[in-house]
Amino acid sequence: MSIKGTAYRVGAHIDTDAIIPARFLVTTDPDELGANCMEGLEAGWIKRVKKNDIMVADENFGCGSSREHAPISILGAGIPVVVAKSFARIFYRNGFNMGLILLEVGDDFEKLGDGDQLEVDAEKGEIKNVTTGETITCAPVPPFMKGILDCGGLVEYVKDRLSK
């Protein structure tokens, strides 16, 4: 579970309406949602992002309404991991349930600048800032959550478990 990409910083208290505005909730198609990811924060934000880039957020990322569309839109934008100072609890569970890797790093998020090149190892709980040479640590993804991620989300995980 190692990912290399460019860091894209967003602020504090980014709610699910900023991640994917309500006017785009007419679908659950990841590509359609991804094309409008973060549209409530910055029009055209998606044009700056490449596959496997990494979102870095301040505190309370994903607050607001409980909707699966928010993590689906992030994944649809090609972003496999969000690193944040902290997450809203309901978003944290929804994110993993949809297959999005989420890592909490506390105040160390300040060491990850916009545009920095990062290498994230979610299994080890390490984030290397290739740009600065600094490595920060966080709690690794727990084994149960890794199982969900390996299957691509909770629904596929349950299907896999039931088939055995």
UniProtKB/Swiss-Prot annotation:
Assigned EC number: 4.2.1.33
Transcription regulation keyword on record: no
A single GO molecular function term of this UniProt record: 3-isopropylmalate dehydratase activity
GO process annotations (BP): L-leucine biosynthetic process
Entry similarity comment: Belongs to the LeuD family. LeuD type 2 subfamily.
Described function: Catalyzes the isomerization between 2-isopropylmalate and 3-isopropylmalate, via the formation of 2-isopropylmaleate.
Subunit: Heterodimer of LeuC and LeuD.
Protein known as: 3-isopropylmalate dehydratase small subunit
